[in-house]
């Protein structure tokens, strides 16, 4: 089923914070996880991801740090982990989303029932 990817643009920050609830990750890993969780229906552009990560760090929702382990098979990677403020942000957004979902369901159910 096709959907307007523009709809997700307003939710990019919460999508990133949601993914980081699982564990700290580096940028490419975050993008790959998002792509997988959406069954490859949504792919976050690298520029969008890093602008969002920077914004979330500035708001103190995420904390970035460099992993200097030699076992990564490449250069240094910047990992991101969720902060206490980030967890609060996530909780607020989940509550907001649940309310929005209820409101929209009222309209969708009415419309669906009228068509049948």
Regions inferred by a protein language model and the residue ranges of each:
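Short, Lys/Arg-enriched N-terminal segment that forms or immediately precedes the first helix
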Residues: 1-5
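N-terminal helix-turn-helix DNA-binding core of bacterial DNA-binding proteins
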Residues: 6-48
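Alpha-helical transition-metal enzyme core signature, strongest for iron centers
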Residues: 27-30, 56, 97
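Basic amphipathic alpha-helical segments that dock to polyanions
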Residues: 49-56
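Beta-hairpin "wing" of winged helix-turn-helix
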Residues: 57-75
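Accessory beta->alpha helical hairpin/"wing" motif in late/C-terminal subdomains of nucleic-acid enzymes
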Residues: 82-86
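Amphipathic alpha-helical dimerization/coiled-coil segments
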Residues: 87-116
């Amino acid at each position: 089923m096709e959907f307007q990817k523009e709809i997700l643009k307003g939710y990019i920050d919460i999508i990133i914070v949601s993914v980081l609830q699982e564990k700290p990750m580096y940028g490419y890993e975050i993008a790959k996880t998002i792509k997988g969780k959406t069954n490859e229906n949504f792919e976050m552009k690298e520029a969008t991801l890093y602008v969002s990560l920077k914004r979330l760090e500035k708001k103190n929702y995420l904390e970035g740090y460099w992993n200097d382990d030699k076992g990564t098979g490449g250069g240094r990677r910047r990992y991101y982990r969720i902060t206490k403020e980030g967890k609060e942000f996530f909780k607020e957004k989940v509550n907001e989303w649940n309310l929005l979902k209820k409101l929209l369901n009222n309209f969708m159910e009415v419309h669906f029932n009228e068509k049948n």
